[in-house]
From Swiss-Prot:
<dbReference type="InterPro" id="IPR047246">
    <property type="entry name" value="ThrRS_anticodon"/>
</dbReference>
<keyword id="KW-0067">ATP-binding</keyword>
<keyword id="KW-0820">tRNA-binding</keyword>
<dbReference type="InterPro" id="IPR004095">
    <property type="entry name" value="TGS"/>
</dbReference>
<dbReference type="GO" id="GO:0004829">
    <property type="term" value="F:threonine-tRNA ligase activity"/>
</dbReference>
<keyword id="KW-0963">Cytoplasm</keyword>
<dbReference type="InterPro" id="IPR045864">
    <property type="entry name" value="aa-tRNA-synth_II/BPL/LPL"/>
</dbReference>
<feature type="binding site">
    <location>
        <position position="334"/>
    </location>
    <ligand>
        <name>Zn(2+)</name>
    </ligand>
</feature>
<comment type="similarity">
    <text>Belongs to the class-II aminoacyl-tRNA synthetase family.</text>
</comment>
<dbReference type="InterPro" id="IPR036621">
    <property type="entry name" value="Anticodon-bd_dom_sf"/>
</dbReference>
<feature type="binding site">
    <location>
        <position position="385"/>
    </location>
    <ligand>
        <name>Zn(2+)</name>
    </ligand>
</feature>
<protein>
    <recommendedName>
        <fullName>Threonine--tRNA ligase</fullName>
        <ecNumber>6.1.1.3</ecNumber>
    </recommendedName>
</protein>
<keyword id="KW-0436">Ligase</keyword>
<dbReference type="GO" id="GO:0046872">
    <property type="term" value="F:metal ion binding"/>
</dbReference>
<dbReference type="Pfam" id="PF07973">
    <property type="entry name" value="tRNA_SAD"/>
</dbReference>
<dbReference type="InterPro" id="IPR018163">
    <property type="entry name" value="Thr/Ala-tRNA-synth_IIc_edit"/>
</dbReference>
<dbReference type="Pfam" id="PF02824">
    <property type="entry name" value="TGS"/>
</dbReference>
Length: 634
């Protein structure tokens, strides 16, 4: 007898081994029709897989997150089916699931075009309409090699070569004449794949290495039903409207160009926005007891070897040489801050010591990974480091947590998730040290009374970290701030203090950033606010516009009055109709437009309009200044 325990605690008995689908059929026809896969004793399996022992079982349907992931994975295989029918000469590589979608890497002699993508999507729809079953066959390794050798799928053969010799059999999934190998599970029938859409094509490299051959990557998305797909498409359309590259160009904030890949050219208005963010964060440094420092851009590689970056990070570093010495352009600020700490003798009574820097860093990101100002090679961080005693970790992390939440709220983010990234496989130090560091972060968050999620293997090579994930206006999540506990680097770089027994000890080093990369944060702000920044943050807060030349001198005096109060203001004295000026500055998302005609000039007033089109009427310049000051203080 096989006893199957269901999630509600009920049990079903079967006289012989039984498949997941057969269990579902025994419960009801409706459930059987909805069954995508099963979870047996916590492990996902195909609906056709047989259970031959007493086990717990959860039926997976499209209502489950796991079900949607399986749908996406099966859609990737469906891409393969369609592509091989349309372009038999191409070679299939890999097709994994990613956030909200999937992709398939394919080797093709020629690049795919948008017309090709449309044809592939059409063929996928035709295949789905055939309502065929997806057949799984667990196949001996030697036979799998023979299958793909006969089909000329050289990349599949390379992938098999990479697998451990312990793997003697693997799953082959058949979509009619098309076959792919996979751990699975996959949908039992193509009827589950109707709510999909191919989204874009890009280039990629075999094994992610630019030295290898280029592949074609087809991206797509798939959902449980059409309603979810339509909602996703609407979100993507909204995201496209909010694209920071589009808004950055429209508002003349910045640009990027081929001669400087991953490096940003900031225009006056964009740099004004940068300065608002930087000055806000500089005040955070001051209010939190940080001394602002400035460290060199390049340092001899010997320092990076001592810090551990050379062994763990050199592939992402830029190097230069001079007078037979090799230097690294800094990818991080931490070793420099240790050098500042090391200049002088510190007592335990001096700790904690806090340093902050708007540190310019460079990382050799792959060109294919670059994305506007969200993923760049040159960036500036609001980077801070605290040198403290072990008993001070909790209070320092708690204070940082409260400050970070205040900053995110000020910039318009109120949905924040907290995660702890735990020890990675490649790391410095022993397990006891990591145990201590991870426990310190858990303890501090516990004191703060917040919930968190843990991410095994996601920590930095020198320590675990708290991550702050912010949800934006259209529901996307961005990872921003971090707080890391580091017991390693102070010892490696000789940071010491004298304890109460006159013994030299290494301090604990806390690495912290609230906004992280300034470039990335500004890109996120642009998209979150769709370019319509709150007035305190807007690069141009006010435009003063005249109706005729007769008001030009008064307009300039109003501009100067506002500028002298510290506001970011410009005057529009062009010989254009006032309606044209209003439209243009509204499209530029300027918070306030002050219109000046003869009446306003005579009365020493301005007519105030908001970018939303609201007419606030006529008021004195001093009254408008009070209004703007009140907004900024809020």
């Amino acid at each position: 007898m096989i006893n199957i325990t269901l999630p509600d605690g009920s049990r079903r008995e079967f006289e012989s081994p039984v498949s997941v689908m057969q269990v579902a059929q025994s419960i009801g026809a409706g459930l059987a029709k909805a069954t995508i896969a099963g979870q047996v004793d916590g492990q996902l399996v195909d609906a056709s897989d047989v259970i031959d022992h007493d086990a717990s079982l959860r039926i997976i349907t499209a209502k489950d997150a796991e079900g949607v992931e399986i749908i996406r994975h099966s859609c990737a295989h469906l891409v393969g089916h369609a592509v091989k029918q349309l372009y038999p000469e191409v070679k299939m590589v890999i097709g994994p699931v990613i956030a909200e979608g999937f992709y398939y890497d394919i080797y093709s002699e020629r690049p795919f075009t948008p017309e090709d993508m449309a044809a592939i999507e059409q063929r996928m729809q035709e295949l789905i309409a055939q309502d065929y079953d997806v057949i799984k066959k667990v196949t001996p390794r030697a036979e799998v090699i023979e299958v793909f050798a006969q089909r000329g799928e050289e990349y599949k053969l390379r992938l098999i070569e990479d697998m451990s010799e312990d793997i003697t059999a693997m799953g082959l999934y058949y979509h009619q004449e098309y076959v792919d190998m996979c751990r699975g599970p996959h949908v039992p029938n193509t009827r589950f794949l109707k709510a999909f859409k191919l989204t874009r094509i890009s280039g990629a490299y075999w094994r992610g290495d630019a030295k290898n051959e280029q592949l074609q990557r087809i991206y797509g998305t798939a959902w449980a039903d059409k309603k979810q797909l339509d909602a996703y498409i609407l979100r993507m359309e909204e995201a496209d409207k909010r694209d920071h590259r589009r808004i950055g160009k429209a508002q003349d904030l910045f640009h990027l160009q081929e001669e400087a890949p991953g490096l940003v050219f900031w225009h006056p208005k964009g740099w004004s926005l940068w300065q608002v963010v930087e000055q806000y964060m500089r005040k955070v440094y001051r209010d939190s007891g940080y001394g602002e420092v400035r460290c060199p851009q390049i340092l001899d590689v010997s320092l990076w070897q001592k810090s551990g970056h050379w062994d763990n990070y050199q592939d992402a570093m830029f190097f230069t040489e001079s007078e037979k010495r090799t230097y690294a352009v800094k990818p991080m600020n931490c070793p420099g801050h240790v050098q500042v700490f090391n200049q002088g003798l510190h007592s335990y009574r001096d700790l904690p010591i806090r340093y902050g820097e708007f540190g310019a860093c460079h990382r050799n990101e792959p060109s294919g990974a670059l994305h506007g100002i969200l993923r760049v090679r040159g960036f500036t961080q609001d980077d801070g480091h605290v040198f403290c005693l072990e008993p001070q970790i909790e209070s320092e992390v708690t204070a940082f947590h409260q400050q970070a939440l205040a900053v995110y709220t000020a910039f318009g983010f109120d949905d924040i998730q907290i995660k702890i990234a735990l020890r990675p496989e490649k790391r410095l130090g022993d397990d006891a040290t990591w145990d201590k560091a991870e426990a310190a972060l858990r303890s501090a968050l516990g004191v703060c009374g917040v919930e968190w999620q843990e991410l095994p293997g996601e920590g930095a090579f020198y320590g675990p970290k708290i991550e702050y994930h912010l949800k934006d206006a259209i529901g996307r999540t961005w990872q921003l701030g971090t707080m890391q506990v580091d017991f390693m680097m102070p010892g490696r770089l000789g940071a010491e203090y004298v304890d109460e027994n006159s013994q030299k000890k290494h301090p604990v080093m806390l690495h912290r950033a609230i906004v992280g990369s300034m470039e990335r944060f500004i890109g996120i702000l642009i998209e979150h606010h769709a370019g319509a920044f709150p007035s305190w943050l807007a690069p141009v807060q006010v435009v003063v516009a005249n109706i005729t030349d007769a008001q030009a001198e008064y307009v300039d005096s109003v501009r100067k009055t506002l500028a002298n109060q510290g506001f970011r203001v410009s005057a529009d004295l062009r010989n254009e109709k006032i309606g044209y000026k209003i439209r243009e500055h509204t499209l530029q998302r300027v918070p306030y437009l002050l219109v000046v005609g003869d009446r306003e000039k005579e009365n020493g007033a301005v007519a105030v309009r908001t970018r939303s089109g609201e007419d606030l009427g006529t008021m004195t310049v001093s009254a408008f200044i009070e209004r703007l000051q009140a907004e900024q203080a809020a």
